[in-house]
Regions:
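Post-signal-peptide N-terminal segment of Sec-exported extracytoplasmic proteins
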Residues: 40-82
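Short domain-boundary/entry signatures in modular proteins, especially
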Residues: 37, 174-190
Length: 333
């Protein structure tokens, strides 16, 4: 019993000295919360993203990325960069012009948080990236996340590791570079544009049209596009009207003319730039823009043509890297 009492006294003395020393553990030490990690810190410390981190540093967007909040980042792995460089005849990220590299990286960033787990029942989602066009307007470029046959970005990039949460947003790992969308990206991938895509395929100049729609814009080397994209129902109605009274030869000519009239290489006409009396030259005909009494924008190819309007006031256009899609309720003809 004496031994136990002695041990108890020694324990109390030891506890007293520990509590009075400067090295004691406080409640704050024991229950200290882990500081949430920023996306930029994660990218900079993970060996799977060394090339992505080098690209961020090389394009001078490090500070920009560090100050973004509530973002979605599709983070390309080293494999993604290696394949991209190989496909473009390069061996180093330094071979990509700095301004192009900055926009390519910003194309992986969306200014809102999107969880892949929330997209199980979503067929298509149009999202605005932080990349901008190289046109005078410098509008933000959109991407399409489709879930028709497995979730993909811009028609070809699957997500490898989804929904990694950080203090300033969410990261989804991808093993392919998400390239800037073109007009063809959306025409290929959007189900609501499938009839228009089929109409182009029926035209005599389908190959040229598709090549133009997917050509990357380079200032001085290619033209900005404005593409009038009719809804599926509008294309069906147009073809039904043709089949009702025309010969096969006339139908083919009408389809060629219709496709040409939806394509303009004149300028990237944003909705805010459309004004009463504006004439847009297309490959098929001049398209006149008018304002109705209720300030609705309408289009026509002549005094006896049908009046064409936007199919919805909620989504009137889609901006891509090489041009803009204006979403209409009828085929311009």
């Amino acid at each position: 019993m004496k031994n136990f009492t002695s041990l108890l006294k020694l324990s109390l003395i030891a506890a007293f000295f520990v509590s009075c020393s400067g090295d004691e553990l406080t409640n704050a030490d024991l229950y200290q919360e882990e500081v949430p990690q920023k996306i930029a810190d994660y990218i900079g410390s993970d060996s799977d993203y060394t090339m992505f981190n080098d690209a961020i540093l090389g394009s001078d967007i490090q500070d920009w990325l560090a100050h973004q909040e509530d973002i979605t980042l599709f983070a390309p792995t080293n494999v993604a960069f290696e394949n991209y460089l190989s496909q473009n005849g390069m061996t180093s990220i330094n071979q990509i012009p700095q301004d192009e590299l900055a926009q390519l990286l910003k194309n992986h960033v969306i200014q809102s948080e999107i969880l892949i787990s929330d997209l199980n029942t979503v067929e298509e989602l149009f999202v605005e990236t932080m990349a901008q066009t190289s046109f005078e307007s410098s509008s933000h470029i959109m991407s399409i996340i489709s879930n028709h046959d497995g979730l993909k970005i811009n028609g070809g990039v699957p997500v490898i590791t989804p929904d990694m949460l950080f203090d300033n947003g969410v990261v989804h790992s991808v093993d392919q570079i998400v390239e800037l969308s073109t007009a063809r990206t959306f025409i290929n991938e959007c189900l609501e544009f499938s009839r228009f895509k089929a109409l182009i395929e029926e035209s005599a100049d389908a190959s040229t049209a598709f090549t133009t729609l997917e050509t990357k814009f380079k200032s001085g080397l290619s033209q900005e596009l404005t593409v009038f994209v009719p809804a599926n129902g509008a294309v069906d109605a147009f073809k039904s009207a043709l089949n009702a009274g025309d010969t096969n030869n006339n139908i083919a000519q009408s389809i060629n003319f219709a496709v040409s009239t939806q394509l303009s290489f004149q300028e990237n006409y944003e909705v805010s730039e459309l004004s009463d009396g504006l004439v847009i030259s297309t490959l098929g005909s001049d398209v006149s823009t008018s304002l109705t009494s209720s300030n609705e924008i309408s289009f026509s190819t002549g005094p006896f043509s049908e009046v064409v309007k936007f199919r919805s006031q909620d989504l009137t256009s889609i901006q891509t890297s090489n041009g803009i899609l204006l979403l209409t309720d009828k085929v311009l003809f």
